Amino acid sequence: MRIALLPLLLFLHLIAHAQQSERMLHIQRSTTEIKLDGNPDESAWQTATVLTDFQRQFPVDTGLATARTELRLTFDAQHLYIAAVCYQQRSSYTVPSLKRDFPSGTSDVLNILLNPSKDGLNGFLFGISPLNVQREALIDNGTTLSYEWDNRWESAVQNFDDRWVAEIAIPFKTLRYTVSQGDNSWLVNFLRGRLNTWEVSTWRPVPQQFPANNLAFTGTLYWDTPPPKPGVNIALIPYSIGSYTQDYKRNPNSLELEEKTGRWSGDIGGDAKIGITPSLNLDLTFNPDFSQVEVDRQVANLSRFELFFPERRQFFLENRDLFAMFGFPGTRPFFSRRIGLARNPLTGFNESVPILAGGRLSGKINDDWRIGLLNMQTKRVEWDSMHALPGANFTVVTLQRKMFGRSALSGIFVDKENALGGLNETQRAGYNSWNRIAGLEYNLNSADNRWTGEWYYHRSFSPDPGQRGYTLAQYLGYSERHLNVFLAYMRVDSNYTAEAGFVPRNGIQNFYPGIGWTFYPKHRFINTWRIGVEGDINYSFDWQETDRDLSFLLDIKLKDQTSMVFRVFNNYTFLFEDFDPTNLNEPGTLPLPGNKGYAYSGARFDIVSSTTYNLQGEMALTAGRYFNGRLLRMEGDISYRWQPIGTFAMSYSFNRIRLPDPYAAADFWLLGPRAEMSFTRKLFASAFFQYNTQANNFNINARLQWRFAPVSDVFLVYTDNSYAEPVPNSPVRFFTPKNKTIVLKMVYWLNV
């Protein structure tokens, strides 16, 4: 039955294949030097083909854009050049700050989308605002953007009353591509976003139901003469760091201060990026440090399971789909945050684990094959005589074969080897000497992006027979202008173990069905509205229902891009063991009894305001039954844009849980004021505060960044953790310190 589904997916892919609306562009090599000054007056620009006639994508996907855009492309031995004339009144600019890598939908922008591999899945985005603020991102799985990726490129902008003019130079060394003897062509698209008119437009039309940056909808860039073969592409990225840390060690029972320690430390390390071939890259790292990476945003965890946090460290991002996208979101065989990060059992915080060295080879072998190899070694950490984390070696091998244009058949092997030597018997408890995963999967993506699907089978291996299991899943979805329907099935064996992956729950079968219908009314304010039904239902292997989340929803999107979702849900949870929904487990309260099912229902309202306005926000309000009690939850974010200086914001989360006596009741607050300032295009500052009563922690993270050269920075980072609330019968008060750290770090990017 399971094996028979793969040919069915292939068949559906073939019948879903549709021709794209063809757009073509020929690019010629420049015979003159291009001076990057925002004034495209060189002779190469006068003879280059002019691209116009951008098509609207939002709020409607018919008709031409209301503001004219003119694009020209040329190249020389080192760079791909783009010249753009974007007509727009200077007084109507929306540019929130001068900081690089601004989020999508927050600024007026011109985006260049490049897909040199022509797979419709993996590419590059380069964006520029009217004030010459840059952003770049990797694109994987057709639409997913990784703005954490940084690389070198240049741009210049001139502003006029009725238009802004940009010149962009992208080094060929920055891109990954191959040069063939015959036809040379890339897939490309260009996107323009203007917030004051709520309009998004593209050169190659993109249907409104899909993201505008979707690589399934691209035109073809033909090179009249082949692009240059990239020469030796080697970049060295050394760093040096100095830090001072204060720790406040307290008695775990009385919380009396036992010892206050302070220590200075310094270190050096770095990365190297080596282009093995124009489309295959080797990343090496020695003693890496990620102290400048933005801290995780804390959330109130009311569930029984581990929460997922995204990877932000740049070393793991390029070609990340080759490593991170296997499996479903709840069954990832490899999760890069298992490397170099671990929970300290004494403090409850995630802390850095020293990485000694590592390497990562990823990219295309040829037009049909991609490969990913990763090996990293971490250092042993001993917290005390009872708690330790063994040093570990992580190895990942992946291989992907392109099929039918945008689909792929892939295999993965993951190996984690724990070095248990040197640990005492207590410290060894719970660790295997090794754990391995082998898996195979097929991903379906039709040419017109209407059909998507996934099929996989993974198996785990460990010395302990009780940790040798499997997981399998199947997904098929169909999306067109009005109809969206999908069905997923996932099965996770009780013995399936992925120590280097993310598998928060075992021993379940999961069904995830959904169907929705979108309407496009001719209305002054409403752009679309959608009704739908979605389910997330878990069963044990003997078909006992363990969890159910059934939702009926109404989704409304306004023409100014404000969105609202009304949802009514019916939930069911079977507790196999006692559980405190507050996760506090405080004395004097009892957990809910296990071996019992709880049915409860409620409603939720979400609203996200338009980013057009300087004052904006989002809110989610949930109210209803919760196990045998009630829950009121309010969470969201409100921000003010002082353009182009910066943004001041406050995130908030409030959870009120009321269960009948003698069970728990609690109010949880999570407040996160933050400020992001851009003094120039090279000097930035940010401050982020997180007040979390559930974790009883108040975190401060402040960062000053000076970009003194392209992709080269000096960071000054201050981090402080203290108590958010007093603890009865102890010396702990609000703001009683836990630890403090100040770090000065310099990173330099050197092209060899």
Where are these regions (language model features)?
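Sec-dependent signal peptide recognition
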Residues: R2-L8
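Hydrophobic h-region of N-terminal signal peptides that target proteins for export
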Residues: L9-H17
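Structural preference for beta-rich elements and adjacent junctions enriched in aromatics
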Residues: Q19-K402, S410-G411
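Outer-membrane beta-barrel and related beta-rich outer-membrane complex signature
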Residues: L138, W198-W203, R250, E294-L302, ...
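A generic structural motif
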Residues: F172-R176, E417, F461, R625
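Catalytic-domain carbohydrate-binding cleft regions of carbohydrate-active enzymes
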Residues: L187, E259-R263, N281, F290-R297, ...
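Surface-exposed extracellular loop regions of Gram-negative outer-membrane beta-barrel proteins
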Residues: P230-D283, R370, F394-F461, P521, ...
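Exposed, low-structure sequence patches enriched in small/polar residues
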Residues: P354-L356, S362, D448-V752
